[in-house]
Curated annotation (Swiss-Prot):
Gene3D superfamilies: 3.30.465.10, UDP-N-acetylenolpyruvoylglucosamine reductase, C-terminal domain, Uridine Diphospho-n-acetylenolpyruvylglucosamine Reductase, domain 2. This is UDP-N-acetylenolpyruvoylglucosamine reductase. Belongs to the MurB family. The keyword Oxidoreductase applies.
């Protein structure tokens, strides 16, 4: 057996909340053969399979009576380079931000707004990760996934992935598809997205009138470091709640009641509300209850001050959801996967 395997192993090093639960089995998959071996082992032992990447979009609320498969495959390359259009590929276990920086170092634009997002390449399509006006689907070409039902490989183009807001086919069917590698369509001709106010403002403050993709990446990294705590210092999973969408009627009703409402109009007429603003209106920013709390600089971020359980984090999240529901009539949906 070439598969690296640990029994009754703590998952604290493998989730950014730093929750100390144990896995019945933990396997580290470095290639497709390891993945297939892990699937066979899980079937042999009658264990469910939980696939993780960087553990940055995960809240563990109990011990995991399963085989936890950590995707650790490495590799990134340029597949084709045709003038303006460059196809790049990365293995699922590649850390996301180093992959972004690798592409920028090669003069490739398209991922700069997604800089410093935690996690792995394989997890990016599951969530359709997004930030500062750009989502993964905007540069997505295709991916290779293994069908856990019959062991076959399948290629998915953008349409087949059914991307939505922090959503995809792979999030809807987590027990079927296991992403092995991802291909993105990047460009050497920069088409920068500078709609997000603080990014444009920071560039102007630095006197950068004609920014490059690397300038945008650097500024976004700086903004994220100011707003979001380092999980190595303070356990967290980044933004804990999705920005909720409301229809035009509800949006107008909310604007009447709250003239300072923060929201972003959508092409379909709906309004995407700033979840952080909704939470902050309830006075939650900087709140602390023992080992769990809300970050002082960003109300969207729930934090583990040390020794918190996943159940304590979930209980705090539920209190915030109830407060926002009562105050605004709006439902907040957690962004991390809860186990």
């Amino acid at each position: 057996m070439s598969l690296e395997l640990q029994e009754h192993c703590s998952l604290k090093p493998y989730n950014t909340f730093g929750i100390d639960v144990r896995a019945r089995l933990l396997a580290h998959a470095r290639d497709e053969a390891d993945v297939r071996e892990a699937l066979a082992l899980a079937r042999e032992r009658g264990l469910p399979l939980l696939v993780i990447g960087g553990g940055s979009n995960l809240l563990l609320t109990r011990d995991v009576e399963a085989l936890v498969l950590r995707m650790a495959s490495q590799g990134r390359r340029i597949v084709s380079d045709a003038a303006d259009s460059v196809l790049v590929e990365a293995e699922a276990g590649e850390a996301w931000d180093p992959f972004v920086q690798w592409s920028l170092e090669r003069g490739l634009a398209g991922l700069e707004n997604l800089s410093l997002i935690p996690g792995t390449v394989g997890a990016a399509p599951m969530q359709n990760i997004g930030a500062y006006g750009v989502e993964l689907k905007d540069v997505f070409d295709s991916l290779t996934a293994l069908d856990r039902q019959d062991g076959t490989l399948r290629e998915f183009d953008r349409q087949a992935c059914r991307f939505g807001y922090r959503d995809s086919l792979f999030k809807q069917e987590p027990d079927r598809w296991l992403i092995l590698r991802v291909r993105l369509r990047l460009t050497r001709r920069e088409r920068l997205h500078l709609d997000y106010g603080p990014v444009r403002q920071r560039l102007e403050e630095e006197g950068i009138a004609s920014p490059t993709a690397r300038d945008v990446s650097r500024v976004i990294c700086a903004i994220r470091r100011e707003k979001l705590p380092d999980p190595a210092v303070l356990g967290n999973a980044g933004s804990f709640f999705k920005n909720p969408l409301v229809d035009a009627t509800q949006a107008e009703r909310l604007r009447q009641a709250f003239p300072d409402l923060v929201g972003y109009p959508q092409a379909d007429g709906r309004l995407k509300l700033a979840a952080g603003w909704l939470i902050d209106k309830g006075g939650w920013k900087g709140f602390r209850d023992g080992p769990v709390g809300v970050h002082a600089q960003q109300a969207l971020v729930l934090v583990n001050h040390g020794g918190a359980t996943g159940a304590q984090v979930r209980a705090l999240a539920e209190r915030i959801q109830e407060d926002v529901r009562r105050r605004f009539g709006v439902e907040l949906e957690p962004e991390p996967n809860l186990y």
